[in-house]
Amino acid sequence: MNARWLLIPTAATLFGCASVQPTQARRDVGEIVERRVGLPDVVPEQQDAESRARVRARVAALMAEPLTVERALQVAMLNNRELRATLEDLGVAQAELVQAGLLENPTISGDLVNSTRGNGLGGGLALSQSLLSAFLIPAKRNLARSRLAHAVVTVGQATLVLARDVRVAFVHAQAAEQALGLHRGRAQAAEVAHELAQRQFDAGNITPLDQQLFAAALDRARVELADAQLAMTVAREDLTRLLGLWGEDVAWTFAAPLDSALPPETELGNLEQQGMRDRLDLSAARFETQSIEYALTLRRRGMIPQLNVGISARNEVGDDIGHEWVLGPSLSLELPIFDPGHADIARIQAFLRQAQHRLQDMAIHVRSEIRVHRTQLVAARRKVEYYERTVLPRAESITELTLQQYNAMLVGTYQLLETRTDQIDSRREYVEALRDYWVARSELELAVGGRIPAREHGRAASH
């Protein structure tokens, strides 16, 4: 009997001391971010007040300087509230793992009876424990471990998605800011042309139609400038939200314009294999399938009838015995007559087949996404290089030749302004091509689940 009473505190010691803090899980996510995004020490292992204060201090230090894409990524990883909420999934999964290793609490019951013959009060006490709960602990822990692994890769995927979103928003905001400057130059050229046309019209040198055409060109330039201002504001706010900023911090500035130095040519031949190996959402789907398999095993073991054993003590009363305490073992057994569990197992089996089909479908989509983004990256790079080699030099040459002819009085001011406007448009299109390249690269990096491998020998354009 003493051994039975000692069983409960011993089990509490063995199963109740595991930590509910997801320190290791957060460390695993931090390693994912460091290896795949290139940012060390941006996932705090603790969530106490001191840790939060350190995070706020780091964000303030980062925002004290103009933003680079690396600095923006650090701020987002530390300060994005949606990511911080997602990180709490690790705490939920860790707590479930600890819970899975615990025995069910013992049950104590009792009754009190009164003798109808005036012999006094009697009753009893019983303490029981489920043996099935102890038998199921290994299966429960396997299921909980799989769910914790699923949570780690799911949160890791969320960090990669956030990194992609920040990079894309960053280059969109950079491009919008540069486009606004180019639109200002275009509007200034249109204003000069309109003023010149107005003076010539007042002097009677051009027709009313020509004067109205120049006025309409100025109207278009002003409308496009207003659209560019709106686009820049929206792009900045998109990035600001991802960085989790508000108040005075929203007045950030860029450290440099959109990067025109493309990285070396990348090796794109084995990206599908890399994606199938490294995609975290694909790993999450695998862990989801594994979790359902463990759940099925757990449910099958749970078909064993519930068995509770314990110890019972009663105070018996009667005419011939007076008051007497009796002590002995107790046992209760569930009778699975109405619900043997077959329907529940069929439901889990259907979930398992569903998860397997979705895993296969995701694998197909992953390969297709990689091929699409790889094609987009190659096309975007070719477009940027064509602008650098051909379009921009030709636009500059045309402007220089037109200026020479203008100085020689072979062409007029209108043609010079028109040439200058065309050059501005070419430059704006080049900025858009650069933006599309960096967006395509960010999308491909997310599609393969990490960084794109670089060739040993490549070209890096610089301006």
Language-model regions, residue ranges each:
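Amphipathic alpha-helical coiled-coil segments and their boundaries
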Residues: 69-72, 79, 86, 130, ...
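Terminal intrinsically disordered/low-complexity segments used for targeting and assembly
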Residues: 1-75, 229-274, 445-463
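Intrinsically disordered, glycine/charged-rich N-terminal periplasmic/extracytoplasmic linker segments
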Residues: 58-109, 154
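Short segments within alpha-helical structural elements
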Residues: 220-247, 358, 394-450
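Small/polar-residue-enriched beta-strand and adjacent coil segments characteristic
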Residues: 87, 93-97, 103-158, 267-274, ...
